[in-house]
Amino acid sequence: MKILSLLVVGALCMGGKVYGEVNGDWNNNGDWNNNGDWNNNGDWNNNGPILDCSTLQCPPRYHCEVNNGNRQCVEDQITLPPFDKCDNVHCPKGFNCKYDWEKDLALCVPWRPYPPVCRTRCPEGHECKVDEWGKECCVKIKCDDICDLRCPKGHECKIKHDGSKCCVRSWRPRPHKPHPRPPICRLRCPPGHECKHDEHGKECCVKKRHHDRCDLKCKRGYECKIKHDGSKCCVKRTPKRPCCKPNSCARDEKCVATKDRIICVKPTCDNTRCPPNYHCICGDKIDGVKCVPDCKKARCDDVECPDFHRCVERRGGILSCEFDPPRQPRSLDWAENENDDRDYDDRDYDDDEYDGDYDGRDGDYDGDYDGDYDDDNYYGDDDYDNDWDNDNDWGNDWDNDWDNEDGDNWNDDDFQDANDEWDY
């Protein structure tokens, strides 16, 4: 690969402009891969696409050549036309010599619509002439060609093609305007016509020509252009930027248009852009690259966890089912004792005064009894040894039990007798 790059760089440094395109490389086994390769038996394996000049578009003034399986854009060898053919051709008055590129002939063609105006300032005794190629030059005035008419200010004497003399508006350059423009034609013309000055400076209406041919011969790198006023000039040629066509590259190649040429590259996910919500994939089982839709992001609404578990979304979008212990249902409120007129529903937990002890029944179980609440729903007390079990049974010395069938009542005679003696 490095040797081939040095050859291309060397060709450019020596003046030969070659735009090469390398479609292969050396693999790890030392074989050359050019969308096909030499196998170990020495045979050519052409499994890849055939690369020829039909799929490569070269810039202007370049043509495609295939050398050693590589396509190259080589500069055209421009053959200059035989301009000397018109040197020995003398055309009659009103005609000039033109070189026909297609027929390779020097032809005498008439001026269309009139000979160009010569604006070159010539020394005394010389006049400006236009040769057969439209080039302005100063030639010595002959004695019989002297225009001796006295013309008014702003006009000058001119000799017509028939030899007659007349005074026409002067277009002679001035010192402050060495290249003055011709006077503006102000004549109103009918549709399809335009105002022009003839060779004598007279205004007239001529029919518009939509397909004027620009026949000026320009130097290399320049081309003929027709201005808005109908005049012709040579301007620098701007190379057109090549464009990719359906057959510019092989089937599995991607066409990239640069400033002066097109390049065929193998598409990869690095140089492939996919639309939104799509991503690029490539591999051995895929022909080239492919854009496939992105996977839908999972949410906890789409996850079903087992019992006593709930879905939690962690950092990075990771979903997990974590244990969620069930909450113990709230105990039934104590009902009012039928033998006591005090309200037992008006109880509270006073953490500040009793340090987290259960303070129900307007101050029951305070610090004097050193009662505590443990995990087994047990109220331990040294003196009274009262406990609260899960069967909603209140066990103490009086064997008070809760009878749900009698309508939320305390049915115990001993408790009723001792209820008034309880120190709240």
From Swiss-Prot:
A GO BP annotation: spore wall assembly
Alphabetical list of InterPro entries matching this protein: Fol_N
Residue spans of biased composition, Acidic residues class: 335-357, 365-424
Keywords: Repeat, Signal, Sporulation
Region (Disordered) location: 330-424
SMART domains linked to this entry: FOLN
GO cellular component, one term: spore wall
Boundaries of every Follistatin-like domain copy: 52-74, 85-109, 117-139, 184-206, 215-234, 299-322
Annotated gene: cotC
Name this polypeptide is given: Spore coat protein SP60
Keyword Membrane applies: no
Signal peptide: 1-23
GO molecular function, one term: DNA binding
